[in-house]
Amino acid sequence: MFRGASAINLDTKGRIAIPARYREPLQLEHQGRIVITVDIQSACLLLYPIHEWELIEAKLLKLSDTDKTQRSLKRMLLGYAHEVELDGNGRILLPPPLRQYANLDKRIMLVGQLNKFELWDEQAWLQQIDECQETIRGEELANNERLADFSL
């Protein structure tokens, strides 16, 4: 499971180094293979270990090619999907179209989301955190059916 936010750098060749604490599980459980695609609701990227991505692909396979919305979803997620592999130094290459989609510059945030990572431009991440806090403070959590029993 992946959790926590890590500040990392994008090098001049378009690579990022995955933090050391995640490398071993990625190598052992997923042979170092990761699929990167776009987030369809935010200007960030999603990084899925290969076995998690295969679950997404199985769901995508069930979507219709004749329904405009379903086809659009498939085009976005699959059209941008790139499989990459950790190199010997724990780095992965982010293809240019993906870097452009998420407006990635030198400073990046890698954010664990249990079964996947989000990859954000650092400034966009800070703005997103502010928006998340406003959303949480502005909503009565007890009125949200899925969050009614959630407590910390």
UniProtKB/Swiss-Prot annotation:
The keyword Magnesium does not apply. It comes from Shewanella oneidensis (strain ATCC 700550 / JCM 31522 / CIP 106686 / LMG 19005 / NCIMB 14063 / MR-1). It comes from the Bacteria. Residues 5-52, 81-124 form the SpoVT-AbrB domain. Pfam families: MraZ. GO terms for cellular component: cytoplasm; nucleoid. GO terms for molecular function: DNA-binding transcription factor activity; transcription cis-regulatory region binding. InterPro entries: MraZ (IPR003444), MraZ_C (IPR035644), MraZ_dom (IPR020603), MraZ_N (IPR035642), MraZ_sf (IPR038619), SpoVT-AbrB_dom (IPR007159), SpoVT-AbrB_sf (IPR037914). One of its GO terms (biological process) is negative regulation of DNA-templated transcription initiation. Forms oligomers. Its main location: cytoplasm. PANTHER family: TRANSCRIPTIONAL REGULATOR MRAZ (PTHR34701:SF1). Keywords: Cytoplasm, DNA-binding, Repeat, Transcription, Transcription regulation. It is found in: Cytoplasm, Nucleoid. Belongs to the MraZ family. Gene3D superfamilies: Transcriptional regulator MraZ domain (3.40.1550.20). This is Transcriptional regulator MraZ.
